[in-house]
């Protein structure tokens, strides 16, 4: 714009020259014009270089650059539960059909307790997503709709990365656009095969998880603690849980190996996402949960009983930090997509101290 304004001013000078002074002025402007004419080229080159650098900096790492593969055939949480019930209908009673609170909506139900018919005290809510929720999941609307935190699936096993994590992660952390959302990453722990050493397999998965996190900028003090998702590792063909091929002691060893490696590499103690029904099914006695109880518990319980009383059934009466209570939450406005929702029950200050998260 500056270039064209000056050019217009200079071009009008020759027609107005009637004196030596004006000719001198024209010569003076003409000299400046040669210098000014180079400005657009310089600006263009600077813009191109800056754009290239910006794009290079903002381009998320793809799976192949990390030596990994994109997840394509993993089951969503809803599909996992369906497969489990198909393989063993008797579990329907234990799960209470995993009835979900389908009417829970952000932000209306965040502020008001429909069970007690009163404003909801001391409760903070969060969301977790994966590529199953779609690339265009409205992350930017979550904080405005009273979601305090967002967990995103990053990886699974030793070979796979969630194809949307590299896009989700920076969007959730875009504080320059006013997004104040405590973001977190979780890894889906794979059982592997009985031939895989449990401790080594756990550590290898941790290294995959850490690799993905670091490649995407690492953790901030305002981020949620890293999480490991330990649940049904369903074979999509048979509907059977692959963990059934593991001994209870191996499962515990793998969890401990994973969490120890992650804590050593990222400097944050992971939380463990787990369902009581799965623990009883795969590991057995609830007393054994004491071996991993040093970690904060992110408990999954979708049962009618838990939702009615807002008191989930924990494992070995362990105090839970976060409770995932539905996979069918929605936003009141802006999107009709369903997603998983969790709650932290307690004062805001306690939320930060309990989970080791820094306030914005």
Predicted regions and their residues:
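Sec/Tat signal peptide C-region and signal peptidase I cleavage site
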Residues: 52-56
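Bacterial N-terminal signal peptides that target proteins for export
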Residues: 32-39
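N-terminal amphipathic/hydrophobic targeting modules at extreme N-termini
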Residues: 4-9
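Functionally critical loop-and-helix segments that line ligand-binding/catalytic clefts
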Residues: 57-129, 137, 288-360
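Catalytic domains of cell-wall/extracellular-matrix polysaccharide-remodeling enzymes
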Residues: 222-311
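Short, Lys/Arg-enriched N-terminal segments with co-localized hydrophobic residues
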Residues: 12-32
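Bacterial N-terminal signal peptides
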Residues: 40-49
């Amino acid at each position: 714009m500056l270039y064209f304004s000056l050019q217009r001013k200079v071009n009008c000078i020759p027609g107005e020259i009637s004196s030596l002074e004006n000719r001198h002025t024209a010569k003076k402007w003409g000299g400046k014009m040669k210098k000014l004419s180079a400005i657009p080229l310089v600006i263009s080159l600077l813009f191109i270089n800056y754009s290239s650098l910006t794009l290079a900096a903002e381009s998320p790492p793809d799976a192949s650059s990390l030596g990994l593969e994109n997840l394509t055939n993993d089951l969503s949480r809803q599909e996992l539960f369906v497969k489990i019930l198909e393989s063993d209908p008797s579990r329907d009673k234990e799960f209470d059909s995993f009835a979900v609170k389908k009417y829970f909506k952000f932000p209306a139900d965040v502020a008001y307790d429909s069970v007690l018919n009163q404003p909801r005290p001391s409760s903070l809510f969060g969301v977790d997503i994966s590529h199953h929720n779609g690339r265009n999941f409205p992350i930017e609307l979550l904080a405005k709709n009273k979601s305090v935190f967002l967990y995103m699936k990053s990886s699974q096993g030793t070979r796979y990365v969630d194809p949307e994590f590299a896009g989700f992660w920076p969007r959730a952390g875009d504080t320059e656009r006013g997004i104040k959302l405590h973001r977190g990453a979780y890894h889906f722990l794979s059982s592997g095969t009985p031939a895989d050493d449990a401790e080594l397999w756990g550590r290898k998965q941790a290294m995959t998880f850490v690799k993905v996190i670091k490649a995407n900028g690492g953790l901030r003090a305002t981020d949620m603690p890293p999480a490991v998702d330990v649940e049904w590792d369903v074979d999509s063909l048979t509907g059977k849980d692959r963990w059934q091929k593991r001994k209870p002691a191996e499962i515990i060893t793998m969890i401990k190996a994973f969490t120890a490696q992650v804590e050593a590499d990222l400097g944050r103690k992971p939380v463990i996402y787990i369902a009581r029904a799965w623990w009883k099914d795969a590991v057995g006695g609830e007393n054994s949960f004491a071996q991993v109880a040093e970690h904060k518990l992110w408990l999954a319980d979708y049962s009618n009983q838990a939702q009615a009383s807002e008191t989930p059934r924990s494992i070995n009466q362990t105090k839970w930090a976060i409770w995932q209570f539905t996979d069918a939450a929605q936003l009141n406005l802006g999107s009709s997509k369903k997603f998983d929702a969790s709650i932290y029950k307690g004062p805001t200050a306690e939320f930060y101290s309990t989970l080791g998260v820094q306030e914005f």
